[in-house]
Amino acid sequence: MAKAKFQRTKPHVNIGTIGHVDHGKTTLTAAITKVLHDKYPELNESRAFDQIDNAPEERQRGITINISHVEYQTEKRHYAHVDAPGHADYIKNMITGAAQMDGAILVVAATDGPMPQTREHVLLARQVGVPYILVALNKSDAVDDEELLELVEMEVRELLAAQEFDEDAPVVRVSALKALEGDPKWVESVEQLMDAVDESIPDPVRETDRPFLMPVEDVFTITGRGTVVTGRVERGIINVNEEVEIVGIRPTSTKTTVTGVEMFRKLLDQGQAGDNVGLLLRGIKREDVERGQVVVKPGTTTPHTEFEGQVYILSKDEGGRHTPFFNNYRPQFYFRTTDVTGVVTLPEGTEMVMPGDNTNISVKLIQPVAMDDGLRFAIREGGRTVGAGRVVKIIK
C-alpha cells in the first residue's frame, strides 16, 4: 500500500482577507493569529505583523505575486489564510488562482466605509467564484457615532447584495490594532469574528467528491501490458476496472477502461485527487492519446474551442510584453499541460490591451480543449508567459 495519509481531524478551509489598501487587512490577519494563539496556545503559533506584511514572492503560471500564508485553528476548523498586501497582488492572485479561497473576510474601515478597491475586490471575488464573504468592520474603536457605524454597515451590505453575495452575512465590528495591543473588549471582537467565520463560511466541497479528471502529462507503452498515461489526479477518485473517457485536442473522444492504477511503482486499487499516478488503459495504442488531453469520468467534461476569458496581462516590469496587443492577436493558451494557439477578439469598444491591464477577451482555439467554467490558463508567446486568465463563459 501507499504511504500513510496525512490525518486531518478537522475540516480544512482556505480563506483570505480582501479589501481596500490601508483598511487593515494585514493587521487583522496578525490580530487573528495572536488572538487564536492566546485562546488555544496548543493549536496555534503567533505571527508578528511584519512576518505577514513582508509577503514572500511566489510564482504562479509565470507571474510573480507577493502573498502571505498563515495557518491557524479554531476548535471547529483548520484554516489556511492568505493575505495579498498590494492591490495588484490581490488581482493577480484572484485571476491566476495562486491561492483559492473557500470564503473571504472583507475588511472595511469604519472610518472610511467602502472605497473603490473595496468594490473591485468584491466584484473580482464574484467573478472568480469565491463562495462566501463576511465583513470585518475594522477601526470601529475610532468611530463613536453609532449611527455612522450603522450607515457604513448598510453600505457594505448593499455592496455585497449588488454582487449577489449574502447581504445578511455577519458584519463584525473589530479593531485589529487594539486586539493586537491586548485590549480585552477588542480581543473579544476578533474572537466573535472567528466564530462568525466558523459558522457562516460553508464547508468546501472536497476535491475527491467531484467527478474524476486527470490531465495527461506523459504516455508510454509497457511491453505485454499496454499503454500507461501518467499525471496528477486533479479531482475525484478512479478505481480499477472503471470506464473513462479521453477528451480534448483530437476531434473525437475515446472511451476505455482503467485496468491498473500505479503510484510509486506500487499497484493500487484506486487513485484520488492529489495523487501522481499511472493509469493502464485497455485497448489503447501509444498513438491514441497525447499530452494535453484529459482522462475523465465519461460524460462529465466536454472539449471546446471558443470561450470568454478574464485575463491579466503582465506589465513590462513583470517580464511581459513591451507593447499593447490588438484584435486578432494570436498567442498560445496553456491549459493544464499543453499550449494551444488561439485568436483573440477584444470586447466592443476596446481598441487595444496594454501590458498591466486586466480585461475580458473572447478566444477561438485551433484545437479543442476539455474545459469547464473557471478553468485557469496562461497566455504565452514562444514559451514565455505574458498573461494569465480563467474561463468565465464557454461559447462553443
From Swiss-Prot:
Would you name any one GO CC term?
cytosol
Q: What is its main location?
A: cytoplasm
Supply the PROSITE patterns for this chain: G_TR_1, G_TR_2
EC assignment: the record states 3.6.5.3
Q: Which residues bind Mg(2+)?
A: 26
Q: Which family does it belong to?
A: Belongs to the TRAFAC class translation factor GTPase superfamily. Classic translation factor GTPase family. EF-Tu/EF-1A subfamily.
By its UniProt entry, which PANTHER family does this protein fall under? ELONGATION FACTOR TU, MITOCHONDRIAL, ELONGATION FACTOR TU-RELATED
- Kindly provide the name given to this protein in its UniProt entry: Elongation factor Tu
What is the phylogenetic placement of the source species in the record?
A: Bacteria, Bacillati, Actinomycetota, Actinomycetes, Mycobacteriales
